[in-house]
Amino acid sequence: MSEEKLIEYRKKLDTDEGLQGKRKLLVGLSILMLAINFTGAVFKEANTFIFKIEFTNQSGLSYFLLLAVLFLLIRYYTYAHHYHEELYKLWSSRMLRDRKILHYHYEAERVDGLLMHAINVWGGDEPGIQASKYHITGLFQRGLLYPTEHHHEDGIEEYEELISLTNFKDGWRKRDYIKLLGYEFKYQFTAFFKYRENLDLVGPYLLGVSALILTVWKLGLLSSFV
């Protein structure tokens, strides 16, 4: 994906007021919960413009904050879901631009790289192979999607063809697939340090889940299920 696409994505992410509002609430409340659990701080009272509130049930307050963070996690995900899809396209397109993984020879109309043995079509017949997209459908289900078309008496039907990367044959071996998963992990992992939008989007989840786990452990909720 081009640099222009990345800049456009960051601009949309930064200017989405709904997403940013939910993000601030989730991060703020999660940090508050973590601070309470790590330091043992307690709420004594809260001043409002009308009256003063005193907190006498600290465990009840912890349950309230627990439910609040859980609710905010769900709300944040509903706002961030389509950004996750675009983020996936960003790192996966970077991976497929790696010549060691996939390289299309325009003159020979063929594919080189790690995926050459997994792709059983010729570029002359299927020119859309040069526009392949990485496709994840399960925990270890991977594939390539490329645009193609079918000519019939009613006209031309355009669709995307799937090449399964878990169908081992014709030189495509399990060790090649494991190597591909290694590249996938590398591109996802390095994205967190090289591209700030990854941590911007995923960071609130990390704080929220950490706050939930620590609070559940402090309240002893896990012991009731053991």
Name every feature range the model reports, one short phrase each.
Residues 1-14, 171-184, 188, 223-226:
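Cytosolic/matrix-facing juxtamembrane and C-terminal tails of multi-pass cellular membrane proteins
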Residues 1-86, 91:
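N-terminal first transmembrane alpha-helix
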Residues 17-32, 187-215:
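Transmembrane alpha-helical segments and their cytosolic interface motifs
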Residues 83-183:
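Charge-rich cytosolic interhelical loops and cytosolic tails of multi-pass membrane proteins
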Residues 211-226:
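Juxtamembrane boundary at the C-terminal end of a transmembrane helix
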